[in-house]
Design a protein with these regions (language model features):
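Class I SAM-dependent transferase core
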Residues: 1-30
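Mobile active-site "lid"/loop adjacent to the S-adenosyl-L-methionine
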Residues: 104-133
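Short aromatic-enriched loop/helix-cap "lid" or pocket-rim segments at secondary-structure transitions
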Residues: 97, 111-115, 163
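Conserved Class I SAM-dependent methyltransferase catalytic core
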Residues: 130-171
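Conserved SAM/SAH cofactor-binding pocket of Class I
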Residues: 20-110
């Protein structure tokens, strides 16, 4: 068990735990009284945090079965009202949101493989580290309400110039 912002979360050896990026998202995402999608939710720390701290409605989504199970367990344990969907990015998402918070892999494939950071079954980015984030940027337009906001996580292990160019072309 770990704690994130006072929220107790069950985890295991093969699931992602909250990081400094998770902490930063909790601080910068404008979630109060908003309908939010937490895309790439991991074990659910942000979705639960948003739900317990004033979000109007929260949907948590991840492709990895273990993350879906742990998010469900953690939401129940913390009495957080969250809709949980197993989805490869937006594949099983059908609603529009005021805010999308996204933390999918932005680590280039070679680094992900060398470090072993990603459990088996979790999609890894391509050699640029940008392909999944770029897909989110492009597809998010279909899932954001007018004046909606997209928050994405990208690291120095991603082709930031490619990501910025995609943002400029789409937003």
């Amino acid at each position: 068990m770990i704690t994130f912002k006072g929220i107790e979360l069950e985890t295991n050896d093969i699931s992602f735990r909250p990081t400094l990026i998770t902490e930063a998202c909790a601080k910068v995402v404008d979630y109060k009284e908003k309908k939010i999608l937490d895309l790439g939710c991991g074990i659910g720390p942000l979705a639960i945090y948003f739900a317990l701290n004033g979000a109007k409605e929260v949907t948590a989504s991840d492709i990895y079965d273990e993350h879906i199970k742990l998010t469900s367990l953690n939401a129940k344990k913390n009495k957080a009202n969250i809709k949980i969907i197993k989805s490869n990015l937006f594949e099983n998402i059908s609603e529009e949101f005021e805010v999308i918070s996204c933390d999918v892999s932005g680590v280039e494939k070679k680094i992900a493989e060398i470090t072993g950071w990603f459990p088996e079954g979790v999609p890894k980015a391509d050699d640029s580290g940008a392909n999944l984030i770029i897909r989110v940027i492009q597809d998010s337009l279909n899932f954001l309400k007018n004046n909606g906001e997209l928050f994405i996580c990208a690291t120095s292990f991603s082709d930031i110039a490619k990501i910025e160019k995609t943002m400029e072309e789409n937003y």
